[in-house]
């Protein structure tokens, strides 16, 4: 959830294996506006970075045609877009595969942030998949 200065709230909701939804509400939060996004987002993240919103989570299915397994990705969110296709713009696919999701995000400045996620894309010395937590330092070049 992200609360705006006017008290309204913005959220991303996962809907099983279907398309995620953008959720909006105003106090007292009894009525919610729901809009389908154009893709599935597992373990969704929604954060404010500078003057923009970012969303993140696991992508799978049609989003990965020609690729192997689920990936964790980050998107710019345009909460005011009028069509499904205009809400999300992917800007990063994190090193990931298999069991992967739940990105975390810490804004350090309007142009720099840390992101964390877990993934099972690496193998141990015996060739068995391991699940590990990863962190990346992101910087926006202006």
Predicted feature locations:
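Beta-rich carbohydrate-recognition and catalytic domains
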Residues: 1-98, 108-114, 118-142
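Signature of short aromatic-glycine-proline-rich micro-motifs recurring in repeat-based ectodomains
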Residues: 102-104
């Amino acid at each position: 959830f992200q609360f705006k200065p006017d008290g309204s709230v913005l959220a991303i909701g996962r809907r099983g294996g279907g398309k995620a939804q953008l959720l909006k509400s105003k106090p007292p939060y009894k009525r919610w506006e729901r809009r389908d996004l154009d893709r599935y987002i597992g373990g969704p993240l929604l954060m404010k970075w500078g003057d923009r919103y970012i969303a993140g989570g696991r992508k799978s299915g049609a989003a990965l045609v020609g690729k192997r397994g689920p990936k964790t990705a980050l998107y710019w969110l345009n909460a005011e877009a009028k069509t499904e296709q205009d809400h999300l713009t992917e800007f990063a696919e994190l090193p990931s595969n298999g069991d992967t999701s739940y990105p975390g995000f810490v804004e350090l400045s309007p142009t720099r942030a840390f992101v964390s996620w877990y993934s099972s894309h690496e193998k141990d010395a015996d060739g068995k998949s391991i699940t590990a937590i990863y962190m990346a330092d992101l910087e926006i070049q202006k």
